[in-house]
Amino acid sequence: MKILAGLGNYEPKYLRNRHNVGFMALDIIAQAWNAGPWRKRFQGLASEVTIGSNKLLLLKPQTFYNNAGNSVGAAAAFYRVKPEDIIVFHDELDLAPGKFRMKMGGGAAGNNGIKSITSQLGPDFRRARIGIGHPGDRNRVTGYVLSDFAKAEEAWLIDLLDAIAGSLDLLAAGDYDAFQTKVTHKAPAPEVVKRGPDAD
């Protein structure tokens, strides 16, 4: 089994925030692959899907973004899933909007959700990093990630989430390099995107 966890905040007012793109990815995956119903488990909402012979647990922690490790750690302990078989989908300030990169291990780079998961599992889990770009000033970061995607960003966002869901068989099989390659081929990042509060 692999665990696919998405980072986000569970209250409705956060639904379309940049910080919730991990939840968005899991919702699209669940819909595309006819996953089972979401149920309250592991301090989150969990759903299961089997792709080929590979079973996946989809997990949306309901702990608020910065405490996601409590949920992911509980699921990992219950199913005895190793960190390398856990993939966390999250927003990435250090990638341009629409860029997608897989990463194995490493630091949290200021992401408190990743930091929380690291405190439970150690650093050696996989990250599926969805670029949202940086507002340019670190004092604007909180407002930026907790604001909705701009209308100008919706086209690449939809394309990227669809590409992630459409390539999931490769991730389920553990072919992470091929997964990243297929996603970026199907949904190349836009060259120029307006972003930030003025883009809405």
From Swiss-Prot:
Site residues by UniProt (Stabilizes the basic form of H active site to accept a proton): D91
InterPro entries documented for this protein: Pept_tRNA_hydro (IPR001328), Pept_tRNA_hydro_CS (IPR018171), Pept_tRNA_hydro_sf (IPR036416)
| Gene Ontology molecular function, alphabetical | peptidyl-tRNA hydrolase activity; tRNA binding
Q: Which reaction does it catalyse?
A: an N-acyl-L-alpha-aminoacyl-tRNA + H2O = an N-acyl-L-amino acid + a tRNA + H(+)
The active site lies at H19 (proton acceptor)
List of residues binding tRNA: Y14, F64, N66, N112
The places in or outside the cell where this protein is found are:
Cytoplasm
Q: Mainly localized where?
A: cytoplasm
Q: Which UniProt keywords apply?
A: Cytoplasm, Hydrolase, RNA-binding, tRNA-binding
Enzyme Commission number? 3.1.1.29
Task: Offer one example of a GO biological process linked to this entry.
Answer: protein quality control for misfolded or incompletely synthesized proteins
Give me the Gene Ontology terms describing cellular component. cytoplasm
Q: Which purpose does this protein serve, as stated in its record? A: Hydrolyzes ribosome-free peptidyl-tRNAs (with 1 or more amino acids incorporated), which drop off the ribosome during protein synthesis, or as a result of ribosome stalling. Catalyzes the release of premature peptidyl moieties from peptidyl-tRNA molecules trapped in stalled 50S ribosomal subunits, and thus maintains levels of free tRNAs and 50S ribosomes.
Q: What family is reported?
A: Belongs to the PTH family.
**What do we know about how this protein assembles, alone or with others?**
Monomer.
Would you tell me the protein name for this molecule?
Answer: Peptidyl-tRNA hydrolase
Species per Swiss-Prot/TrEMBL record: Maricaulis maris (strain MCS10) (Caulobacter maris)
